[in-house]
């Protein structure tokens, strides 16, 4: 099945395909490392479990979210169809936006939601350069 994705309108015309691919893989690797680490932390670190309780989420949600993150990481790193990668990027966008909203809703400061915001920047760069490839 052929992809219907189009090159982003803001794409710089003078960036080489090799540079685009290199930047994509560097940013995507950093993003996937962050998502893998948070998936691990959600499953194994008690202080992260306490944070989920503080945010009002049930204990089972950590397991579900970690599994979804790991599946998304695999889809971004593997040679998967474009539609599946789009779904992975959409899932990560929802996850990161929800993390920001949840932390702000309970009054947490930037020390709590800053990582989600920084990871969101990595997400945006990864998605942008994926679309350029």
Predicted regions and their residues:
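Membrane-interface extramembranous regions
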Residues: 2-133
């Amino acid at each position: 099945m052929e992809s219907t994705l189009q090159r982003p309108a803001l794409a710089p015309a003078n960036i080489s395909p090799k540079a685009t691919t290199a930047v994509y893989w560097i940013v995507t690797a950093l993003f996937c490392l962050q998502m893998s680490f948070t998936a691990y932390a959600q499953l194994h670190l008690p202080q992260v479990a306490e944070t989920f309780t503080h945010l009002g989420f049930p204990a089972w949600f950590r397991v579900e979210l970690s599994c979804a993150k790991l599946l998304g990481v695999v889809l971004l790193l593997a040679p998967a169809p474009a539609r599946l990668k789009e779904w992975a990027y959409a899932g990560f966008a929802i996850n990161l936006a929800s993390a920001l909203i949840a932390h702000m809703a309970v009054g947490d400061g930037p020390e709590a939601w800053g990582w989600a915001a920084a990871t969101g920047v990595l997400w945006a760069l990864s998605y942008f350069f994926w679309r350029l490839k």
